[in-house]
Amino acid sequence: MRPAGRSVQQVRPVTITRHFTRHAEGSVLIAFGDTRVLCTASVEEGVPRFLKGQGQGWITAEYGMLPRATHTRNPREAAKGKQGGRTLEIQRLIARSLRAAVDLTKLGEYTITLDCDVIQADGGTRTASITGACVALADALSSMQKKGQLKTNPMKGFVAAISVGIVAGEAVCDLEYVEDSAAETDMNVVMMEDGRMIEVQGTAEGEPFSQQELNTLLELARGGIDSLVQAQKAALVGA
């Protein structure tokens, strides 16, 4: 039996709290069960040098964990003087995923930075970051419209992400830490709301997985992402 008695396809309770901080154009606290991530979207005029003069915008991301987001304290990466490989991988994933949600040619020469800070980690921090950052991004784009910085909203659709895996021989959706640490196969899936895939990261930690198991995992991911998109849209009602 899974922790908390969840079924194989059941995601953890998800809450999305908008306008969590005052200053950012978009700000969301998202919870996937006991995993909590603060996601902010900040708008700045200008784009990276390689895009100057092209009339299009850019979306980038930064990711980090508070020192005591985990069971034992991890020193801040700033104190070490450099970011770790995992951090760099995750923030690039977040940025790639959210760029897929926006028509950058309609953004104008603005850069939106998505900052995802893990307050508490219990598995799925990158998937929670992407899902929460999408809502923060939606709020930032709405803010830009209200300020007259955008004529139309360039958002093409919602993006969400979920983890799936094989634990004790069974395919399950939305792994928490105890499941993730024991998984034979671990996979993160990022999708548009219409089911088109943005990224699939899958690794066999133990036994290799079959094509049939891969299909089962992707079906579980689609169901989980559908429920996350519903939560995103519900959070934005009345935006």
Swiss-Prot record:
PROSITE patterns: RIBONUCLEASE_PH. Keywords: Nucleotidyltransferase, RNA-binding, rRNA processing, Transferase, tRNA processing, tRNA-binding. One of its GO terms (molecular function) is 3'-5'-RNA exonuclease activity. It catalyses: tRNA(n+1) + phosphate = tRNA(n) + a ribonucleoside 5'-diphosphate. CDD domains: RNase_PH_bact (cd11362). Pfam families: RNase_PH, RNase_PH_C. Phosphate binds at R86, G124, T125, R126. InterPro entries: ExoRNase_PH_dom1, ExoRNase_PH_dom2, ExoRNase_PH_dom2_sf, PNPase/RNase_PH_dom_sf, Ribosomal_Su5_D2-typ_SF, RNase_PH, RNase_PH_bac-type, RNase_PH_CS. GO terms for biological process: rRNA catabolic process; rRNA processing; tRNA processing. Its EC number is 2.7.7.56. Belongs to the RNase PH family. Phosphorolytic 3'-5' exoribonuclease that plays an important role in tRNA 3'-end maturation. Removes nucleotide residues following the 3'-CCA terminus of tRNAs; can also add nucleotides to the ends of RNA molecules by using nucleoside diphosphates as substrates, but this may not be physiologically important. Probably plays a role in initiation of 16S rRNA degradation (leading to ribosome degradation) during starvation. NCBIfam families: RNasePH (TIGR01966). Homohexameric ring arranged as a trimer of dimers. This is Ribonuclease PH. It comes from Sodalis glossinidius (strain morsitans). The lineage of its organism: Bacteria, Pseudomonadati, Pseudomonadota, Gammaproteobacteria, Enterobacterales.
